[in-house]
C-alpha cells in the first residue's frame, strides 16, 4: 500500500507485477488514502483492473523544515489540522484493524506515506508480517515508527543514509517499470518524433512530478524564450496548474509543448537530452535508469527536507546538477545557463549521466518481491 503521490504508487505496481508473474493466483489488494484514490486506481488498473483499490482514513502530522518548532507550535491553523488528523489516524487504525481481520493477508507491504501508519500499526497488533520500503535518503516519520516492528526493511538509497537495524534492512533501490532503460540515439530520435518534437534540436523536459511544481513552472514561464534558444521545451505542469499556464503560454508545436500530465513518461524522458525536475526519490531513480543528464531543483520546504537530502546523495557522486530554488527564483536565467553548460560539454555531461546510471537497480522489483515472499507467514 501507499499514497499521497505517484512516487508511492508506481513502485508498488512494479512489485505487484513481479508478484503476479511468480504467483499468478496471488490475491492482491491496494490500499491508499481517499484523496489519491482516483490516480491510484488509474495506475493500478493499467496493470490489472481486477486488483481492488480501497481507501483508508488517514491523517498526517504536518512539519515544515523551514520553520522552527516554536513557529509551528504557535501557528493556530497548523496545530488545529494536526489535532484533527490525530483523530483520523485513530479512525484509520480501527478501520485497518477490522479490514485485516476479515482479509487476513499473509503479508502487508507499505511503500511509505502517512496513510501507511494506521495500517502498519494494525498489522503489528495482529502479528501479520510487515515489509516496508523507504525511498528517500531521509526516512519519513511513518517508516521510522513502523521500522521498530517491521519484519523486513528495504531502502531506495545506500544503507549509510539510514539508521535502521542492519540485520533486517536491505538496499534494493526503488522498483520502477521495466520500460525505464537507456535509449539509443535512434530510439531517442524516434521518441522525439512520437511526441512531434523537432528531432534535430536538443530537448529539455521539465516536470515537477504528478502534482506539478508552481515555482518551477514560474521559472519556465518567465524564461521560455531564452530556453528555446538552447532547445525545444516540453513542460509537464501538473493538472492543477495546466489551465492557468495554457492561457499564457504558446500553442503546442515542434519546439514547445505543455501538458498537465503524461501517462507514458518513460517515452518522454527517453526523448529528452536534459531533464529538469524535483528531487522525488522515484523520479530520480527512473532518470538514473535512463542515464539522463538531470538538473534537480529540490523543494526545501517539504517535511524533513527530504528532497534536499535526496539531491545531496547524487550531487556528491557527481551524478546530477543541483540548483537551489531560492537562488533560482532570484536569478531565473540560472536554469538556462546550467543547461547551456551541460550542452557545451557533452563528454563531461555524458560521464555525469553514466555515474547517475550506476544508482539504477533494475532488479529492485524482483528483490522486493523476494523479500515479501520470504516474510509471509506459513
Residue ranges and their predicted role:
Residues 8-20:
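Short amphipathic alpha-helix
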Residues 17-22, 31-32, 36-48, 60, ...:
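Donor-nucleotide binding loops and adjacent catalytic segments primarily
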Residues 26, 50, 124-189, 197:
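Active-site-proximal region of nucleotide-activated glycan assembly enzymes
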Residues 45-50, 94-109, 117-131, 144, ...:
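Glycosyltransferases and closely related glycan-assembly transferases
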Residues 49-104:
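Phosphate/nucleotide-donor binding subsite
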Residues 106-107, 270-285, 292-293:
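Acidic donor-binding loop of glycosyltransferase active sites
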Residues 341, 348-362:
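A short, well-ordered alpha-helix in the C-terminal region of glycosyltransferases
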Residues 361-378:
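C-terminal alpha-helical cap of glycosyltransferases
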